[in-house]
Amino acid sequence: MSRVAKAPVVIPAGVEVKLNGQVISIKGKNGELTRTVHDAVIVKQEANALNFRPREGFRNAWAQAGTTRALLNAMVVGVTEGFTKKLQLVGVGYRAAVKGNVVNLALGFSHPIEHQLPAGITAECPSQTEIVLKGVDKQVIGQAAADLRAYRRPEPYKGKGVRYADEVVRTKEAKKK
């Protein structure tokens, strides 16, 4: 039994929720998100909250209900507050710049990298070694940050590379003679 699914998702003022079978749309001041819910989950809107119940006949219904609750809660937070992800570039000559929807990276390769951001995500560079991604959809933000990090992951000897702002890179000791 999922303890997560038992807690309702509170719908704040200014957020509109539409239930159409298994398709749920959540609209707020930052935008609108839509998601199709798994068949094993029953979603009911009561007053200003969404409640979740498992449907009979599905083996993993409680697990799906907990997952659905977490996903819909992230959607509500996204359309009200939004999500941010911060990246740092550590290394000599590693730089970033943003032009429109394209992030230009200089990461020590023989060529510059131009990364096209997905729709609905904005990026800004407070400094040449920092990138801040903002958006409504938590999954898309995380994937965009992971794609940028994948160009040059932090290496374990000096820690150079693209890392999340809150990431702690464990460094190894150099080989001794």
UniProtKB/Swiss-Prot annotation:
Lineage top rank: taxon: Bacteria
Task performed by this protein: This protein binds to the 23S rRNA, and is important in its secondary structure. It is located near the subunit interface in the base of the L7/L12 stalk, and near the tRNA binding site of the peptidyltransferase center.
SUPFAM superfamilies: Ribosomal protein L6
Subunit structure: Part of the 50S ribosomal subunit.
A GO MF label: rRNA binding
Organism expressing this protein natively: Buchnera aphidicola subsp. Acyrthosiphon kondoi (Acyrthosiphon kondoi symbiotic bacterium)
Protein name: Large ribosomal subunit protein uL6
GO cellular component: cytosolic large ribosomal subunit
Pfam families in alphabetical order: Ribosomal_L6
Example of a GO biological process term: cytoplasmic translation
Keywords, in A-Z order: Ribonucleoprotein, Ribosomal protein, RNA-binding, rRNA-binding
Family: Belongs to the universal ribosomal protein uL6 family.
Disulfide-bonded cysteines: none
Signal peptide: none
